[in-house]
Amino acid sequence: MADKADKMKARLPRGFVDRVPDDLRAAEKMMATIREVYDLYGFEPVETPLVEYTDALGKFLPDQDRPNEGVFSFQDDDEQWLSLRYDLTAPLARYVAENFETLPKPYRSYRNGWVFRNEKPGPGRFRQFMQFDADTVGAPNVSADAEMCMMMADTLERLGIQRGDYAIRVNNRKVLDGVLDAIGLEGEGNAAKRLNVLRAIDKLDKFGPEGVRLLLGKGRLDESGDFTKGAQLPEAAIEKVLAFTAAGGADGAQTIANLQAVVAGNAEGEEGVQELADMQALFFAGGYEGRVKIDPSVVRGLEYYTGPVFEAELLFDVTNEDGQKVVFGSVGGGGRYDGLVSRFRGEPVPATGFSIGVSRLMTALKNLGKLDVSDTVGPVVVLVMDKDTQNLGRYQKMVSDLRKAGIRAEMYVGGSGMKAQMKYADRRAAPCVVIQGSQEREAGEVQIKDLVEGKRLSAEIEDNVTWRESRPAQITVREDGLVDAVREILDAQARDRAEQSK
């Protein structure tokens, strides 16, 4: 026997989680619903590998020579850098570029899978998580962007989220670029300062307009005494940026009119406002007014996207870790990224897409009671009373007959006695067990114990002797009638569950 000191400690790496059967089944049911909507819209599934050449991930990497921050990377035997994918969009761009001549254009696809971030883990922040994306590559006009927003709205509603509990919020990178150009931050030379402005606007929900004003100016001192240096904009520029974030009106038409006033005279800004107006017209034509909203405060990802940008936000309250009521917030986002595929081809390739955070959306559905986490019915367990080869074959035939009839079943393969086997069946959430000892075998019979009904009756029969003598919820049937008898029990249990769920 190995010395205690030689035992390896079982430990899960930080930032990763194990997933249990109920979570896996609930996630699969949720993703099946998402697939139904995407299929309805005419999108096709595609799957890319978890590993890509590091240079294919492009702008996500801070250091191409030592790609060990932000992504998990390693070198193969010919010393080329490979990385676990950071998201699902960069691999799609590589796939489209590599198969460009054979794919239909526009190319409409969806995919779900694990992505990895080599970042410091924390509460709700993992190094491995699931995303579900849909993208259209090769469509230059905003009808493709509008379709993404409408598809996301339909997806949330198909999952059981009611209108009024969510909003798809839409902005446009070109409008903000017009504002930044107007305050003198045009060109690559101001890229760092532009990014600081974007980050300041992104804090609008957290700090409010006055907090953003400080971050756009000299900086902000928080309650703990920490100082965040600001973007150092002059007062007139700050007012211009804040006017942009406050341009939201009572409806889409008013918001668009406000934005037109903010960017008047700037060609790029005016182009962005017109794109929003075109999208708004499509939302109205499709019956999505009130579900999709033009909102200038949406800036998440604007440093990455090239045109329309959108975010799916859930509007109901939840209690956070500090016991405070807060709006649940974002469960997905996307936008137009016309530059990503072009990196591989040297020619313009327009693209737009949307990404859902699967784990976060599951949490939201759980809070709403809309996630299907109902207990899965376990397998019928055939108990093994006699372990000789001949009788094992008889038990095996029973379980095979049940499976052929489409009934989930297993034969106990452990080494314990009947009491332990019954405990095992209970832990497996078995609906019933099949028992055949020597007496039943000689009579050509089997006993079937309904564990669900047995639990219910046990609460009514308090005396142990009476319980044992009455053998509640246990029947004896001919061995050749096993399948029909088990099916009757399962059907009765299904009717009871349906009645209880009403």
Swiss-Prot record:
Alphabetized InterPro entries for the sequence: aa-tRNA-synth_II, aa-tRNA-synth_II/BPL/LPL, Anticodon-bd, Anticodon-bd_dom_sf, His-tRNA-ligase, HisRS-like_core, HisRS/HisZ, HisRS_anticodon
EC number annotated for this UniProt entry: 6.1.1.21
Keyword Lipid biosynthesis: yes or no?
A: no
Keyword Zinc-finger applies: no
Query: What top-tier enzyme class does this entry carry?
Result: ligase
Biological process (GO) annotations?
A: histidyl-tRNA aminoacylation
UniProt main location, coarse: cytoplasm
Protein name, entry field = Histidine--tRNA ligase
Species this protein is from: Brucella canis (strain ATCC 23365 / NCTC 10854 / RM-666)
